[in-house]
C-alpha cells in the first residue's frame, strides 16, 4: 500500500504521452475503467483555473442556493477529483465516487484523451472553465510550491520554461484549452471563462443554472454569488483546503486560495517572458476563436 511520503516530490510519470502526478499514475487502470452515470456533471479544467470555485457554484446551483446543504461536507468529498490518489493518506477519487449518490459532480484536470470513455458514451454534461494562461502559470507555480505531491517547481524562471513546454502535470495548457474548446461542438459542454465569471458572476451562474436545467430567482442567484465570492471562500475551511494534512499541502508556503484575481501575471512575467508566451499562443491557438482576457481592468 505504501504511505503518503512515498509519493512526495516525485518526478512526473508519463501516461499515454501526458505528464501526470506520480501518485495519481499509480493504479491508472482504475481511472480508465471508471464507469460514469448519465446524470454525472463533470468539471474538467486545467489546474489553477478556478476549479474549486466552479465546483462550489455547481453544488450550490444543484441545491437551489441552500447554504446549509452546501456545508454538509468538505469540497473534496462533495466534489471528488476523479484521478486523485494519495496512498495511505486519503481515499482515492474513484473510491469516493463509487459511494457518492447521484447526481455526482466530478472534478478532473484530465486532458480529453485521458478522460474515461464512459463519460462520452453516456453524454455526461460538462462545464469547462478556462483561465488566461499567464495567470494560470503564476498560480500553478505557487500551488506547486505548497503541494508536496507535485515535483518541486524550482525558480519561477525554471518553472515557466517547463509550463510553456507542457512539461508540467497534465501537459500543455495550450493543448488542453484548445482540445476542450473544439470538443464542445459534438458534446454537451458549457465552456466558460474565469475572467467572465469574475466580471459578472450572476450572469455566468445563470448560464450554469440554465445548462443544468435549474431555474433560480434573483435572490437565490445573489446568495450564490456572495457565498462563492473569493473573499468568503478563502475563509471557508470547507473549501479552502486547510482540511488536508499539512504534509500534503503546506499553506505556510503559499495558501491554496492565493489571490483569485485577473492580471497577477504582470507581477511575475518579464517582457521577454510575456512575448515568448504570446508567440506560443499565436502558434498554437491563433486558428481558434478562443478569446482570453489578461488585463484586470477589462475583466
UniProtKB/Swiss-Prot annotation:
It is found in: Cytoplasm. Substrate binds at residues 107-109. The keyword Transferase applies. Transmembrane segments: none annotated. Sulfotransferase that utilizes 3'-phospho-5'-adenylyl sulfate (PAPS) as sulfonate donor to catalyze the sulfate conjugation of dopamine, small phenols such as 1-naphthol and p-nitrophenol and thyroid hormones, including 3,3'-diiodothyronine, triidothyronine (T3) and reverse triiodothyronine (rT3). May play a role in gut microbiota-host metabolic interaction. O-sulfonates 4-ethylphenol (4-EP), a dietary tyrosine-derived metabolite produced by gut bacteria. Belongs to the sulfotransferase 1 family. This is Sulfotransferase 1B1. The gene is Sult1b1.
Amino acid at each position: 500500500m505504501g504511505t503518503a511520503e512515498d509519493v512526495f516530490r516525485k518526478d512526473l510519470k508519463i501516461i499515454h504521452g501526458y505528464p501526470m502526478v506520480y501518485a495519481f499514475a499509480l493504479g491508472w487502470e482504475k481511472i480508465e475503467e471508471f464507469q460514469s452515470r448519465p446524470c454525472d456533471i463533470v468539471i474538467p479544467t486545467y489546474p489553477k483555473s478556478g476549479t474549486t470555485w466552479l465546483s462550489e457554484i455547481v453544488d450550490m446551483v444543484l441545491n437551489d442556493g441552500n447554504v446549509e446543504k452546501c456545508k454538509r461536507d468538505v469540497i473534496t468529498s462533495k466534489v471528488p477529483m476523479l484521478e486523485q490518489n494519495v496512498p495511505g493518506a486519503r481515499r482515492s477519487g474513484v473510491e469516493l465516487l463509487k459511494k457518492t449518490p447521484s447526481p455526482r459532480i466530478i472534478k478532473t484536470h484530465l486532458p480529453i484523451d485521458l478522460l474515461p470513455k464512459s463519460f462520452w458514451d453516456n453524454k455526461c454534461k460538462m462545464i469547462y472553465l478556462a483561465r488566461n494562461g499567464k495567470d494560470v502559470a503564476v498560480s500553478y507555480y505557487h500551488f506547486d510550491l505548497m503541494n508536496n505531491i507535485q515535483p518541486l517547481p524550482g525558480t519561477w524562471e525554471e518553472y515557466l520554461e517547463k509550463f510553456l513546454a507542457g512539461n508540467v502535470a497534465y501537459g500543455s495548457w495550450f493543448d488542453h484549452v484548445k482540445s476542450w474548446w473544439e470538443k464542445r461542438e459534438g458534446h454537451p459542454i458549457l465552456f466558460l471563462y474565469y475572467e467572465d465569471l469574475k466580471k459578472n458572476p450572476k450572469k455566468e451562474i445563470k448560464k450554469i443554472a440554465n445548462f443544468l436545467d435549474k431555474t433560480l430567482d434573483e435572490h437565490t442567484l445573489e446568495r450564490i454569488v456572495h457565498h462563492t465570492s473569493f473573499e468568503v471562500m478563502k475563509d471557508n475551511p470547507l473549501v479552502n483546503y486547510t482540511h488536508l494534512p499539512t504534509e500534503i499541502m503546506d499553506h505556510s508556503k503559499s495558501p491554496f486560495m492565493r489571490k483569485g484575481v485577473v492580471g497577477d501575471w504582470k507581477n511575475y512575467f518579464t517582457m521577454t517572458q510575456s512575448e515568448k508566451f504570446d508567440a506560443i499562443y499565436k502558434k498554437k491557438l491563433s486558428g481558434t476563436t478562443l478569446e482570453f482576457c489578461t488585463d484586470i481592468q477589462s475583466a
